[in-house]
């Protein structure tokens, strides 16, 4: 019996609808195939502390989809500390026309992400095994996103060299990070803050959008 059932498909479809994210049959199939890989590989690779497939739908898939409206601009995106691929893999599935780079320093996690790329045939997805400080792309990214990666201060400092004046930094957080905002480097500013309602997720979710000031 597959770990991914019609129940999970229904939960994904219902949650995406609540978020206002349009999922055609192919995108839903790819997201569920990704979920199946995450469940399978998590047993050996410890990709996420979430073990229950029901929780994975809400806390990983729907949480990733909650930022889709804020990631529509820009063609070249970086997911820093991608881990098990959230939100980078769902964004690559939702936006096949965009280029998504998934960066992580953990070899087990990048091996998993490479397998996801191959099995789901995600031609727009690139996996990079590197520490963020050592990563030197050819050009700045249009958007840089992180989910439970670091403090806002570290996120800004460690990725400063990866973006420019037009880049948007998207930081996915739980409770509103008031103390972290107080430590934000002077050359960064908060462009927008959004409280996110993720179907099936308990607790607060916030998205902070940052830009460089210099």
Swiss-Prot record:
Q: Which InterPro entries match?
A: rRNA_ssu_MeTfrase_G (IPR003682), SAM-dependent_MTases_sf (IPR029063)
In Swiss-Prot or TrEMBL terms, this protein is called Ribosomal RNA small subunit methyltransferase G
Gene encoding the protein: rsmG
Species the sequence originates in? Pseudomonas aeruginosa (strain ATCC 15692 / DSM 22644 / CIP 104116 / JCM 14847 / LMG 12228 / 1C / PRS 101 / PAO1)
Task: Supply the source organism's classification.
Answer: Bacteria, Pseudomonadati, Pseudomonadota, Gammaproteobacteria, Pseudomonadales
Report the function annotation for this chain: Specifically methylates the N7 position of guanine in position 527 of 16S rRNA.
Q: Which reaction does it catalyse?
A: guanosine(527) in 16S rRNA + S-adenosyl-L-methionine = N(7)-methylguanosine(527) in 16S rRNA + S-adenosyl-L-homocysteine
Q: Which GO terms describe its cellular component?
A: cytosol
Write down the NCBIfam families for this protein, in alphabetical order: rsmG_gidB (TIGR00138)
The cellular location(s) given in this protein's UniProt record come to:
Cytoplasm
